[in-house]
Curated annotation (Swiss-Prot):
Its main location: nucleus. The gene is bzpM. It comes from Dictyostelium discoideum (Social amoeba). GO terms for cellular component: nucleus. Residues 221-250 are annotated as: Disordered. This is Probable basic-leucine zipper transcription factor M. It comes from the Eukaryota. Residues 291-312 are annotated as: Leucine-zipper.
Length: 588
């Protein structure tokens, strides 16, 4: 038997694998035979039923087989349950043998039980109870022993209160128990200590002598210290007397110091005077500082005003209406982009056209932030005085794309400029190959822009005339010194007019920007680029000789050394109005 068991562990893996294959083949053959037998039986039953009835009942046979033959899973479950029940019965029998108690049936978990019922049902073993009782008895015995020991000590102390036990008389066990809670090393030290005192016993007289000797030594030390302190004090007093003798003797006073009296009222007055003088000096310093700070502020304001006056005197008409450097940079960038657009149109490069158009729109959007800065320069009272005295009324700025649309509605008097302004837009439509929808949308946009532009133009002309009247009234009132209230009232009126003018200018500029951005939604990128190129070329060819002439007149007036009055300025600008009248008569 031993040899066979040892050989089982020495099989090769090939042998094990071959045995596994044989087992699988045997199982497969058995299953196959069982299936064939069941199929043959089913076929025989179906043939018999067909001979009797003439119909195959396949479904009924299958259902009967399913009802008769339990499945493999159900069989496994039943076997498992039976096995578990057997195990449970064996455990209960073992439990009954160990604890000699009656057999308990298994609990029905469907029923509900409280904790008390479970405790009553489940029995406790007798061995555990015995152990608990023994532990309790041991604890009680230990407590009783400790109490007895403590009582004995208390009784001994009460019996002998007067006797003082020396170290020799005290037993070592008592010392260990009361004073020391130490290991073996401490016990050795105590034993050595007791042996030493046994060999050299201490008499009670020695203790008294040692105490007396210690007391005498302490007294001697204290006396020595007191003597030293007295000697030091005597030496100090003697030194002080010598110093007093060495000092020069003072002259004897002719009057007694005790008879001198002081007036308290005079002392209080002096104190009040000193305090008042201090307060006055502090206030004076603060006042001087305030005046100095005010003087510095006034000097700074005067210097600033002088610089502004000098700069305004040297400013020409062109410098007055010159835009900000940021807006100039924006215009120059737009011109560069338009040149690049023209080149891209010639090369027929659509990708570069889209990129340049995006860059152009981003540059023109900066105009919104620069509008208020430019408008503040125009709506400034100083610049408005110069413009009104010069007789120049600023027209609202229009886009070059929509310029000429308003003359189309009016009767054309054969002007070449108006014909050019109308013809270039028609040429652009043909060149860009616009559809009918695109051309209609552009025409509607131009008409809307024209209507809003005309309303703004009328409102601004009215405001310019009203501002000019207010300036004339202020100038006339300034010659009469008595009309100070009228000047202040007109000043408030002028402020309100300038604010409204500022709002109108901002709205006109925003109108141009909004209409320009809406063009990109109507046209294609190539068409928009072509429109920008054509409109830019047309707008750059226009000139404004009136503004140039006005700038020249204004520079001549300011360059003269003598201070010019209002009437002299008006006389010098008479030529400008005469030339305008001549041009109007020619056109009519």
């Amino acid at each position: 038997m031993e040899e066979s068991n040892n050989n089982n562990f020495l099989f090769s893996p090939d042998y094990i694998w071959s045995q596994l294959l044989e087992n699988n083949n045997n199982n497969y053959n058995n299953n196959y035979n069982n299936i064939n037998n069941s199929i043959n039986e089913n076929l025989l039953n179906e043939l018999n039923s067909f001979q009797n009835t003439g119909v195959f009942d396949l479904d009924t046979n299958i259902e009967q087989q399913q009802q008769q033959q339990p499945t493999e899973i159900q069989q496994q479950l039943q076997n498992y349950q039976e096995f578990q029940q057997k195990k449970y019965q064996e455990r209960q029998e073992q439990y009954q043998i160990q604890y000699q108690q009656s057999y308990i049936e298994p609990l029905n978990f469907n029923e509900t039980y409280n904790n008390e019922t479970y405790c009553n049902i489940i029995p406790q073993p007798p061995q555990v109870e015995q152990q608990q009782e023994q532990e309790q008895e041991q604890e009680q015995q230990q407590k009783q022993q400790q109490q007895q020991y403590i009582e004995k000590q208390i009784q001994e102390i009460i019996k002998i209160p007067e006797k003082r036990q020396t170290l020799n008389q005290i037993p070592i066990e008592m010392m260990q128990h009361n004073f020391f809670n130490t290991p073996k090393l401490d016990q050795q030290l105590l034993s050595n200590y007791s042996d030493f005192f046994k060999t050299n016993p201490i008499l009670p007289t020695t203790t008294t002598t040692t105490t007396t000797t210690a007391i005498t030594i302490d007294q001697q030390q204290q006396n020595h210290i007191d003597n030293q302190s007295l000697n030091n004090s005597n030496t100090k007093t003697s030194k002080n007397q010598q110093k007093d003798n060495n000092l020069p003797k003072k002259k004897n006073l002719s009057y007694d110091i005790t008879k001198i009296t002081f007036n308290n009222n005079n002392i209080e007055k002096k104190r009040d005077q000193t305090e008042s003088s201090k307060n006055f000096r502090e206030k004076k310093k603060e006042y001087v500082k305030e005046i100095e700070s005010k003087i510095l502020a006034l000097t700074l304001e005067n210097d600033k005003l002088k610089k502004e006056n000098d700069s305004l005197k040297t400013i020409n008409g062109s410098n007055l209406m010159r835009p900000e450097p940021e807006s100039i940079n924006m215009i120059m960038e737009c011109k560069k982009i338009i040149k690049k657009l023209e080149k891209a149109l010639i090369d027929n490069d659509e990708r570069s056209l889209i990129y340049l158009l995006y860059h152009y729109h981003s540059e023109t959007s900066k105009r919104y932030s620069l509008v208020e800065i430019e408008v503040d320069k125009i709506a400034n009272p100083y610049s408005q005085i110069k413009l009104k005295l010069a007789g120049y009324i600023q027209n609202p700025t229009t886009l070059d794309i929509f310029d000429g649309n308003f003359n189309n509605n009016n009767n054309n008097n054969g002007n070449k400029e108006e014909e050019e302004e109308i013809s270039w837009f028609i040429k652009y439509k043909n060149e860009a190959n616009l559809t009918i929808e695109q051309s209609n949308k552009l025409d509607l946009l131009r008409n809307q822009h024209g209507l809003i532009f005309e309303t703004l133009l009328k409102e601004r002309k009215q405001l310019d005339n009203e501002i000019l009247k207010v300036f004339n009234e202020i100038i006339i009132a300034s010659y009469d010194g008595s009309n100070a209230n009228l000047i202040s009232d007109k000043g408030f009126e002028l402020k309100s007019k300038l604010k409204s003018l500022k709002m109108k200018i901002i709205s006109s500029l925003n109108l141009n920007l909004d209409t320009f951005s809406s063009i990109s939604s109507i046209l294609l990128p190539k068409q928009e680029a072509l429109l920008l190129v054509r409109a830019h070329l047309f707008g750059s060819s226009k000139l404004n000789p009136q503004m140039d002439f006005l700038n020249n007149v204004w520079t001549n007036i300011i360059s003269s050394n003598s201070s010019c009055s209002v009437f002299e300025i008006l006389n010098s600008l008479k030529e400008f109005s005469d030339l305008e009248n001549l041009e109007l008569n020619k056109n009519s």
